[in-house]
Amino acid sequence: MSVRVRFAPSPTGFVHIGSLRTALYNYLFAKKSNGKYILRVEDTDQSRYVEGAIEGMLRSMAWAGVHHDEGVVFTGETLGQKGDFGPYIQSERLEIYKKYMDILLEKGHAYYCFCSKERLDEVREKQKVEGLNAGYDGHCRNLSKEEIEEKLNAGQPYVIRLRLPENKDIQFHDIVRGDVVMNTADLDDQVLMKSDGFPTYHFAVVVDDHLMEITHVIRGEEWLPSTPKHVYLYEAFGWEAPQYVHLPNILNADRKKLSKRQGDVAVEDFLKKGYLPEGLVNYIALVGWSPEDNNEIFSMEELEANFSLERVSKSGGVFDVHKLNWVNGHYIRESSVERITDLAIPHLIEAGYITESDAQERYEWLKDLVSVLQDRISYVAEIKEKAGIFFNAEIELKDEESKELIQVEHLPQLLDVLKAKVEAAEVIDEEFGKSVFKEIQKETGIKGPNLFKPIRVVLTGEVHGPDLPLVMKVLGSKNILDRIEYVYDLIQSMK
């Protein structure tokens, strides 16, 4: 049987970075196996449904380059579906679930439960006081057929629960974790169908995975404790269970599960900050999977060729934003200046440095600006911090060293010569920037750091930074002269 895998998110909000990794691993395994990757929407919990979440998820996955073969898709501006195993939205499959629930009831592997919320709360409170594991106490498990009919005819609300056998070991093999065994004494009779007629995740996922011929279930480790119930459902229906892969959690630096309280966790957050899709995908692939060699830079095609489930880790991987920035910075440096300029323009507008008309009229100049900063940013939004030296009328002295350099005795001499050279120049380009320092050195006898460092501080306010000839080209004659005058005044005020 050919490989078929699925990513099955719930439309409850933003796409978590962990969800992107789950989708990515499913996609990569399908590609490596010449199989199919399906995207199914699990919206059985209608109380948590968020309008627009499906569309947002599809946009995030398209941005990341994680494309599915079957499932929910955009057809123009609206949602559609493609594939032969649909519907791919669970709320459109209610009749299918009812059919298979009737089979389960008929076989005696499920039962009606008429317990009220108040009774269930009392049971849980009693279990808590007595130090027992929380779970359903089986109150409705052995109702007679007549009692059930009477309650149904009276219109009593109900749910349908899984009837687990008593004291039975349920075993399954996980490709990452090996053999897993759990006894039904440690499980409770899970609700399979809610009172609103919607199935719970545990029932719908088994029916859907079977009918869609899913061969491998690749999902987060939070589903590991529920898997014995799913395995038992396959057994109850007489179906062959898929192979399971439970992925390790993505952790914060303190090794707790990645949380929005401690930083960005939504794919949209990274997109807005100007991370490149290839940078985020490359990095997130490495959080929980280790390649055979020490290489850390992988294109999507290289990931498709190298990925294997056998090299997925059991233990959680730490999300290291510094490592992400290093990987993403690599892709920024490898990108064309046009691409990064186009991505940078909204951030420069947001910072108030340029207007939309500036973006069109001064595009070539903006490309020059970006080319100066491109190898100094880890994500595109960072350009807002770095670009101020080209827009602010006054320099800002960043540290003690820059403040000391602005007071060196020979600085006025350097500024006098630099000012004269700039005023005499027909154009300030990179060639001018390279030649002017040789001329200043020749005329003043000042060279090396004593020449370059003070002038860099005058032009940028910083001791270190991009190549000075490039900086001068982007600043242009007026800005250079304005800064020289500003520093003249600054020197006078310090006396």
UniProtKB/Swiss-Prot annotation:
What's in the keyword line of the UniProt record? Aminoacyl-tRNA synthetase, ATP-binding, Cytoplasm, Ligase, Nucleotide-binding, Protein biosynthesis
Q: Which reaction does it catalyse?
A: tRNA(Glu) + L-glutamate + ATP = L-glutamyl-tRNA(Glu) + AMP + diphosphate
> Where is the motif named 'KMSKS' region mapped on this chain?
257-261
Q: What CDD domains does the annotation carry?
A: GluRS_core
Q: Does the keyword Ligase apply?
A: yes
Where it sits in the cell: the answer is:
Cytoplasm
**PANTHER family attached here?**
GLUTAMATE--TRNA LIGASE, GLUTAMATE--TRNA LIGASE, MITOCHONDRIAL-RELATED
Assembly behavior: Monomer.
What is the name of this protein? Glutamate--tRNA ligase
Source organism per UniProt: Alkaliphilus oremlandii (strain OhILAs)
Q: Which taxonomic lineage does the organism of this UniProt entry have?
A: Bacteria, Bacillati, Bacillota, Clostridia, Peptostreptococcales
